[in-house]
């Protein structure tokens, strides 16, 4: 049996497979979390109250929810890499802004922990997606 160290193609294949598995796990969890929060923002009165507590107008909550739904759809769809970059950038801005908003009004970890944890899922998804992009460009 040949060592994968002697065959760079085997290392690349294993790395790509691992990155693909990591990407889909992180992206699925991230997408579920974002979809859940978007749905909650549209339907749960306590979430609407939280937006008011943060100082945001009600229409912003609705716009943000629909933007999240669209972002998740684009994240999971086979779209051009540049568009997916913009989706990741948009989610980074949303999560960073949520974290800052909660900290600015003095909320505790029970409030700002959700955007922080979702940010970790975002970072993992983006990291693995970039690894797959690099592997794809090297194979061309």
Feature-to-residue mapping (PLM):
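Membrane-interface extramembranous regions
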Residues: 2-140
